[in-house]
């Protein structure tokens, strides 16, 4: 596993040995004092100690926001070499070697801890990247499909609701027209019924008048019948009287004939009696014919009047029956029209109630869909904000990862440097004032602004600010 420095708070043994703190952070200049492992040669070999001081600074640049590391060698000091005839202080070298081994052991432990922390950090970064990818896919899915589908469903349902409203409006208009037509028919039938009632009343009045006339005609007929009976009785009485007179005349004629026979000298009375008889018979026949003619004329007049009255009565009765049938038919038709009107009014009320309930349901559905759309837009905006935050965190983590990668590469290159033998340690220590005067860090702040409206990205702007620390 690679070894790297990842914390600026740890206490290194470099402070005890070299007096400096090899600490670094993302926002401050990073320095890593590197020194080679000391080694002792033979007496005839020359040894030298080289101390190199590097300054590693992170410079953020470019559109991607990734930092680059720049390492510069501050200086190097080389210890004077000793010849073969010079003596070495082994006690000093031994002490330095022991302290160096202790320092390396502490560094290994610290690097192990840093490696564990770095592995945890990488796992966390991977987890955040997975969450970021899932959220990005969710945002893309919501942005690309759901709003348009919801809008299509909303428009389709609105079109269906409008079509149903138009159908119901047309049905209501048609029912209103039918109701108006039925009301007109009902008014016309009522007017016709009133006319028929008036005609019935007139017919009843005429019938009452006809009944009075019939009664008068009946009384007149009865009177005439009584008169006819009286006349018949009178005619019979006159016949009897006439017969009596004839018998008396015949008797008188017989007596006169006897007297004539007895008295031939008397004038002939037979011719006179015959003349008188013929005269009386003529008068009687004339009276009888006149009476019969008067009786027949009176009877015919009464019969004609009775027939006329009977015809009028029969016609009145027939008209009354027809009027009764018409009144019954009109009454049945009015009852049927009333039932039809009641059923149509009931259907119209039911249609109005159903239309009102469906309209309220459609309004509730519209409000619910609008609320769902607002909720989806708010959720989309929240996902976009989270996505933007995760994107910013990812960019910052990418910068830190790049920095750690550079640090790890630098540390590996430092560890893999060839170890030279040395006889004495001589290093160059730079003061904080000198390091401060030589170290410059360039800090780049990238501000990314995303404007959303109703859950959709309207504009996106990126701004970079450079600061030199």
Curated annotation (Swiss-Prot):
The modification ADP-ribosylarginine is found at residue 58. Residues 107-415 form the IF rod domain. It is found in: Cytoplasm, Myofibril, Sarcomere, Z line; Cytoplasm; Cell membrane, Sarcolemma; Nucleus. GO terms for cellular component: cardiac myofibril; cell tip; cytoplasm; fascia adherens; intercalated disc; intermediate filament; neuromuscular junction; nuclear envelope. The modification Omega-N-methylarginine is found at residues 16, 37, 70. Residues 267-414 are annotated as: Interaction with NEB. Residues 108-140 are annotated as: Coil 1A. The modification Asymmetric dimethylarginine is found at residue 37. One of its GO terms (biological process) is skeletal muscle organ development. Residues 151-251 are annotated as: Coil 1B. Residues 412-469 are annotated as: Tail. Muscle-specific type III intermediate filament essential for proper muscular structure and function. Plays a crucial role in maintaining the structure of sarcomeres, inter-connecting the Z-disks and forming the myofibrils, linking them not only to the sarcolemmal cytoskeleton, but also to the nucleus and mitochondria, thus providing strength for the muscle fiber during activity. In adult striated muscle they form a fibrous network connecting myofibrils to each other and to the plasma membrane from the periphery of the Z-line structures. Homomer. Interacts with DST. Interacts with MTM1. Interacts with EPPK1; interaction is dependent of higher-order structure of intermediate filament. Interacts with CRYAB. Interacts with NEB (via nebulin repeats 160-164). Interacts (via rod region) with NEBL (via nebulin repeats 1-5). Interacts with ASB2; the interaction targets DES for proteasomal degradation. Interacts with PKP1. Interacts with FLII. This is Desmin. It comes from Mesocricetus auratus (Golden hamster). The lineage of its organism: Eukaryota, Metazoa, Chordata, Craniata, Vertebrata.
